[in-house]
């Protein structure tokens, strides 16, 4: 099985920390979202992943589909920070 690599950046932190995650193509993207959130200590239930262009990603897909459609460079947004000042 082929693997895909995602670079996920935490946008709510001014230092913009990131994690590189390698998973198989058939891994559900919800698992990638949950793992990334655990790495950044943010709640996965209220977080979203977007592209660098600001387009939201539906996590109910395989990691391979997300990689093909959106590439490897993604951003994590804890939803409690969305729209806040």
From Swiss-Prot:
GO cellular component terms attached to this protein's record: cytoplasm; nucleus
Organism domain of life: Eukaryota
UniProt xrefs under Gene3D superfamilies: Phosphatidylinositol 3-kinase Catalytic Subunit, Chain A, domain 1
SUPFAM superfamilies (UniProt xref): Ubiquitin-like (SSF54236)
Family according to the record: Belongs to the UFM1 family.
Annotated crosslink Glycyl lysine isopeptide (Gly-Lys) (interchain with K-? in acceptor proteins) location: 83
Function: Ubiquitin-like modifier which can be covalently attached to substrate proteins as a monomer or a lysine-linked polymer in a post-translational process called ufmylation. Ufmylation on lysine residues of proteins may play a crucial role in a number of cellular processes.
Localization of this protein: Nucleus; Cytoplasm
Residues joined by cross-link Glycyl lysine isopeptide (Lys-Gly) (interchain with G-Cter in UFM1): 69
UniProt keyword terms in alphabetical order: Cytoplasm, Isopeptide bond, Nucleus, Ubl conjugation, Ubl conjugation pathway
Pfam family, one: Ufm1
Encoding gene, per UniProt annotation: ufm1
Record carries keyword Nucleus: yes
InterPro entries linked: Ubiquitin-like_domsf (IPR029071), UFM1 (IPR005375)
Chief location category: nucleus
Record propeptide residues: 84-85
UniProt keyword annotation of RNA-binding present: no
Protein name per UniProt: Ubiquitin-fold modifier 1
GO biological process terms held by the UniProt record: protein K69-linked ufmylation; response to endoplasmic reticulum stress; reticulophagy
């Amino acid at each position: 099985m082929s693997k895909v690599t995602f670079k996920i950046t935490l946008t709510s932190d001014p230092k913009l920390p990131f994690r590189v995650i390698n998973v198989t193509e058939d891994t559900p993207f919800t698992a990638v979202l949950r793992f990334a959130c655990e790495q950044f200590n943010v709640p996965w239930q209220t977080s979203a992943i977007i592209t660098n262009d600001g387009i939201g990603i539906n996590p109910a897909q395989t990691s391979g589909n997300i990689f093909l459609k959106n590439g490897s460079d993604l951003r994590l947004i804890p939803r409690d920070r969305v729209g806040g000042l």
